[in-house]
Curated annotation (Swiss-Prot):
One of its GO terms (molecular function) is proton-transporting ATP synthase activity, rotational mechanism. The record marks S371 as: Required for activity. This is ATP synthase subunit alpha. It is a peripheral membrane protein. HAMAP family: ATP_synth_alpha_bact. Pfam families: ATP-synt_ab, ATP-synt_ab_C, ATP-synt_ab_N. It is found in: Cell inner membrane. The keyword Cell inner membrane applies. It is an enzyme of class 7 (translocase). The gene is atpA. Produces ATP from ADP in the presence of a proton gradient across the membrane. The alpha chain is a regulatory subunit. Its EC number is 7.1.2.2. Belongs to the ATPase alpha/beta chains family.
Length: 510
């Protein structure tokens, strides 16, 4: 056999030139035990709290939550059935982060930001940590711009502003999600404009809900053209507790992208009671000490650190906003339970929905007496302030009188008038689902009710009166609605035109 030294030396030179002197160091650990979505891992001495770790054999990821002397408690994001005792666990050296940006609009993703709608990969250029600090005091500004829901009873009586946190609370099947969907649909005209400062991007976080419910919601948004400016994050009932715990923070990180870039976003957490239950499950399995109702001691902090991230930013910080509408489900109308009282104390007000009102046919079933907005009329346009102040007073007096009227046999004329007006205003605030009203139409309809033009109309015809009045006004005097929309107030000449129009319509209504 002939030995060719030149050829051999050439091969050796190439080998030496391409030799990689860098060593790839991976810090690994071993699974001690696994079950119920929690893995105990030995090793990983330098792992960070909240760091993503990988289980290469099982193809799933997890997050390090409990850092103890001799082991690390890891919550598993996915199915833990493929994880075995003794499996290798590797550090990723990054805290849990998710894709953010406009590429997510119109998409349905899971709690880690992975697409689950079958529309291909997400086009996102930026990633953000799911857990970040809320803005401080200096970067914030008081809430002053209205966030129109399109629901008369809310926009008039419990106004919500951009950057506010308003709790939607009520028993199951009282129309909580219906109000949310109406609010999303109502943003369509604003999002059709080119002005970024007026647009409101919508984010819906479904925690612990049925998959069929989420699919139906997405279909409704698509049918009404609202999905193109919305993001849906789904951690459904069949997913492990860590995913349900993480989903609200994921949604919040996506919303903060809009807030920090001078845009406006609305985020809905539906619902935080299920997130608290998922967190309780994780905490108990991690052997953290239980507190009241077996919730861990930091369940208040779980929600406060999430909701504090919703804010209206000052002009120096881009003037963006993130508005939060957390949802809480009560048991038998008990708003004084542990989780409801926690979230009520964190938020800037609550919209309380009642089963009794729902079954009476008052829908949306908002209990105006128990609902409040701590931002108040600062979040209303001037036109709404002009008409809504009176309706609050009238309804409060009506509720008080209605309670006494049950026991009184003969009532004086003024009381009868007050009861008749109250019944008509209650009827006026009813609204069909998926039919949000523009603010100028709401103003006209409340103006008509508070000025007494409905006093002679039979209660069962109030809905017809309102619908016909608005359609007649659009056809014959659209300038009245245009004036209210553009000026954001009812000017003297507009009011005169409005009164004349309503009077002539009322006389011809039959």
């Amino acid at each position: 056999m002939e030995i060719r030294p030149a050829e051999i030396s050439e091969i050796l030179k190439k080998q030496i030139a391409s030799f990689d002197t860098e060593t790839d160091v991976a810090e690994t650990g071993q699974v001690l035990s696994v079950g119920d979505g929690i893995a105990r891992v030995f090793g990983l001495a330098n792992v960070m709290a909240g760091e993503m770790v990988e289980f290469p054999n099982a193809g799933v990821q997890g997050m390090a939550l409990n850092l103890e002397n001799d082991n690390v408690g890891v919550v598993v994001f996915g199915d833990d059935k493929a994880i075995r005792e003794g499996d290798t666990v590797t550090r990723t050296r990054r805290i849990v982060d998710v894709p953010v940006g406009k590429g997510l609009l119109g998409r349905v993703v899971d709690a880690l930001g992975n697409p689950i709608d079958g529309k291909g990969p997400i086009e996102a250029t930026e990633r953000r940590l799911v857990e970040t600090k809320a803005p401080g005091i200096i970067p914030r500004k008081s809430v002053h711009e209205p966030m129109q829901t399109g629901v008369k009873s809310i926009d008039a009586l419990i106004p919500i502003g951009r950057g506010q946190r308003e709790l939607v609370i009520g028993d199951r099947q009282t129309g909580k999600t219906a109000i949310i969907v109406d609010t999303f649909i109502n943003q369509k005209p604003l999002n059709a404009q080119d002005d970024e400062s007026k647009k409101l991007y919508c984010i819906y976080v479904a925690v612990g809900q049925k998959r069929s419910t989420v699919a139906q919601l997405v279909r409704t948004l698509e049918e009404n053209g609202a999905m193109e400016y919305s993001i849906v994050i789904a951690a459904t009932a069949s997913e492990p507790a860590p995913m349900q715990f993480l989903a609200p923070y994921t949604g919040c990180a996506m919303g903060e992208y809009f807030r920090d870039n001078g845009m406006h976003a609305l985020i809905v957490y539906d619902d935080l009671s299920k997130q608290a239950v998922a967190y309780r499950q994780m905490s108990l399995l991690l052997r953290r000490p239980p507190g009241r109702e077996a919730y861990p001691g930091d369940v208040f902090y779980l929600h406060s650190r999430l909701l504090e991230r919703a804010a209206k930013m000052s002009d120096e910080f881009g003037a963006g906003s993130l508005t939060a509408l957390p949802v809480i489900e009560t048991q038998a109308g008990d708003i004084s339970a542990y989780i409801p009282t926690n979230v009520i104390s964190i938020t800037d007000g609550q919209i309380f929905l009642e089963t009794e009102l729902f079954f009476k046919g008052i829908r949306p079933a908002v209990n105006v007496g128990n609902s409040v907005s701590r931002v108040g009329s600062a979040a209303q346009i001037k036109a709404m302030k002009q008409v809504a102040g009176k309706i609050k007073l009238d309804l409060a007096q009506y509720r008080e009188m209605a309670a006494f009227a049950q026991f009184a046999s003969d009532l004086d004329a003024s009381t009868q008038k007050l009861l008749a007006r109250g019944a008509r205003l209650t009827e006026l605030l009813k609204q069909p689902q998926f039919k949000p009203l523009p603010v100028e139409e709401q103003v006209v309809s409340i103006f008509v009710g508070t000025r007494g033009y409905l006093d002679e109309v039979p209660v069962n015809r109030i809905g017809d009166f309102e619908a016909q009045l608005i359609s007649e006004m659009k056809a014959r005097s659209p300038e009245i609605l245009d004036s209210i929309r553009n000026d954001r107030e009812i000017k003297k000449e507009t009011e005169t035109k409005l009164v004349d129009f309503v009077k002539s319509f009322a006389s011809s209504f039959a």
